[in-house]
């Protein structure tokens, strides 16, 4: 298996993308499996485990629970010297969604007959198929392995008890959005519907920071569309 080659997100599971009924949840995706991401995200156990894991690299697949978070952080000026500061702590609400996605991923790996499953949580040993994968081979489609394999069920129970709050859990934030959100009025955001900063002449923002909220998906096409829209407005303003 050469999972470090080819596209990084060629499929996804959207069954869990609306866990609260308001569009907040997770998508399950395969991700980039190059060495610096694969091994930097592993929970440290000991040197021997790290070396053995490196030897297994050709057999490793990496997956993520991509969370559309409900709760927000903030960007603010340092009160002393004005340097921009970032404050973001993942809320319990959003962490619960992330954990549900991780649990779903472990079940997908189980039915795909993975012989070892790691959840990137400090202190949580990996699930290892001690019977050589016999129970996985006997798994019936449409059944939940949490209720058919006692060993796997016990491991899932330990996973649910584990604290998935950083720094115990490895969380990665990518594609930051909405720090200069677009809004219909000055009280609700930073820029207007044309990307112009409220109350400032000649200043525009044209990237993912103008999203009204996190999109919950990789935002490249949306960011390009917004940049195209705003840049056309800039051209129109300059020519008028």
Question: Over which residues does each language-model region extend?
Answer:
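A conserved FAD-binding loop/helix module that cradles the flavin
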Residues: 213-234
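FAD cofactor-binding and catalytic pocket of flavoenzymes
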Residues: 1-109, 116, 126-131, 136-138, ...
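Residue-level detector of alpha-helical segments with a strong bias toward transmembrane helices
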Residues: 16-17, 123, 217, 226, ...
């Amino acid at each position: 298996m050469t999972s470090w080659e080819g596209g990084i997100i060629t499929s996804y599971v959207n069954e869990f993308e609306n866990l609260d009924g308001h569009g907040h949840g997770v998508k399950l995706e395969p991700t980039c499996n190059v060495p610096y991401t694969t091994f930097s995200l592993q929970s440290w156990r000991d040197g021997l485990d790290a070396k053995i894991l490196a030897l297994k690299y050709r057999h490793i697949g990496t997956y993520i629970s991509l969370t559309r978070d409900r709760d927000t952080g903030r960007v603010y000026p340092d009160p002393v010297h004005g340097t921009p500061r970032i404050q973001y702590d993942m809320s319990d609400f959003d962490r619960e969604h992330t954990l549900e996605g991780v649990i779903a991923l472990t079940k997908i790996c189980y039915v795909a007959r993975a012989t070892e499953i790691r959840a990137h949580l400090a202190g949580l040993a990996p699930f290892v198929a001690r019977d050589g994968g016999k129970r996985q081979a006997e798994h019936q489609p449409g059944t939940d392995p949490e209720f058919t394999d006692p060993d796997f069920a016990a491991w899932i129970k330990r996973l649910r008890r584990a604290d998935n709050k950083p720094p115990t859990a490895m969380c990665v934030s990518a594609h930051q959005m909405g720090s200069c959100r677009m809004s219909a009025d000055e009280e609700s955001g930073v820029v207007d519907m044309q990307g112009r900063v409220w109350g400032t002449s000649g200043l525009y923002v044209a990237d993912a920071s103008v999203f009204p909220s996190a999109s919950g998906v990789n935002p490249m096409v949306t960011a390009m569309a917004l940049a195209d829209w705003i840049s056309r407005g800039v051209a129109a303003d300059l020519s008028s």
